[in-house]
Amino acid sequence: MASPPRCSPTAHDRECKLPPPSAPASEYCPGKLSWGTMARALGRFKLSIPHTHLLATLDPLALDREPPPHLLPEKHQVPEKLIWGDQDPLSKIPFKILSGHEHAVSTCHFCVDDTKLLSGSYDCTVKLWDPVDGSVVRDFEHRPKAPVVECSITGDSSRVIAASYDKTVRAWDLETGKLLWKVRYDTFIVSCKFSPDGKYVVSGFDVDHGICIMDAENITTVSVIKDHHTRSITSCCFDPDSQRVASVSLDRCIKIWDVTSQATLLTITKAHSNAISNCCFTFSGHFLCTSSWDKNLKIWNVHTGEFRNCGACVTLMQGHEGSVSSCHFARDSSFLISGGFDRTVAIWDVAEGYRKLSLKGHNDWVMDVAISNNKKWILSASKDRTMRLWNIEEIDEIPLVIKYKKAVGLKLKQCERCDRPFSIFKSDTSSEMFTQCVFCRIDTRGLPADTSSSSSSSERENSPPPRGSKDD
């Protein structure tokens, strides 16, 4: 085991008293974006204008070189399809663009009961945002001296941590913005997460291929597991009970570590056919989702003992055209979102494993995604230096979604085991599919791990690095 990391903690003040925004986040004026704002979003001009954008159904990043229709003479009106660019006219999702970082935005979160946003960037900053007007509320002081690869926040939104390529993990008080402590390691840190109860911090190592679990209260080391994987860690996270740590790696392996017994509970080898980029638990802790450079996502049962040797999974395919960088479950696990290097955010129907909608607009890799607790908003962070806040509360009323449901013949059922509502294809003849949701089907079937994903023993060398890789 490595010796405990050096640190310099200061006073702790965990109570957060940030007031909620007074204006509704859903206010917007479609079609009222100024040409100056659009020009800034396009990056073609350097204008001294605010870095905020009104929530609108128009996508300034998808515009052609011509100004919007209301600024053109009548004979030069731009067709509607040019205004929408990559967006399908039947999937008009209201959104807001948040600009303020000077480099790729690597990580994003909702916090303070969805009234604030948190971001970290390769510009070495960690910022707190007001989602109503898109302004930066705070730049956290004593910032890292190298790119920020990931940040995390406690469940009560009192403390923030960030991992950086300067080999440090730093913690701040969210309300005051003051640095609480800094821990320096001997290797690069590529991932960091608070436990849901705020007691622990887990960090993932690059060169050492391991993880470190630290007591966040006393700033002492609980466990250091070197060579936990055979290649660099890409992501790690706690389960909702703060008792298990999941980690994924370039070695295509998934591992579950028990904090109390300090032992590996579960190992799934060759879980994907390429490097695994990210992982996240459902809020029950029963299932784990992994995203990969193989363009797929998988949902694994990591709770019941009978799956300890081989795992059990459902594969989500054909959602991205390139490597998948990130994934995040809704609080009730009714849907899942993922971000990809194809510049899109995919919204998945978990019950039936199909892509419900694809959100387009970013002009570079989507590096991280998040879902608000009320399930009305999606936040995406991109290498294009922006974040996007998407309003999805009326997603089931979108013409494109309705059109797809009619085409495939979806209908709503209730799971006989857990009473969870789920959708099914009318054409499916399997009786089990008509009675149980996807999670209960994994439990009852005891599906073996998907062997098709482990057929390849080599990884694509030209694949882009996952979120948290220092090669970018």
From Swiss-Prot:
Pfam families: WD40 (PF00400). Residues 458-472 have a biased composition (Basic and acidic residues). Residues 1-22, 447-472 are annotated as: Disordered. The keyword DNA-binding does not apply. The keyword Repeat applies. Gene3D superfamilies: YVTN repeat-like/Quinoprotein amine dehydrogenase (2.130.10.10). Keywords: Repeat, WD repeat. SUPFAM superfamilies: Quinoprotein alcohol dehydrogenase-like. WD repeats lie at residues 100-139, 143-182, 184-224, 228-267, 271-310, 319-358, 361-400. InterPro entries: G-protein_beta_WD-40_rep, PQQ_b-propeller_rpt, Quinoprotein_ADH-like_sf, WD40/YVTN_repeat-like_dom_sf, WD40_repeat_CS, WD40_rpt. It comes from the Eukaryota. PANTHER family: PTHR45048, WD REPEAT-CONTAINING PROTEIN 88 (PTHR45048:SF1). This is WD repeat-containing protein 88. It comes from Homo sapiens. The lineage of its organism: Eukaryota, Metazoa, Chordata, Craniata, Vertebrata.
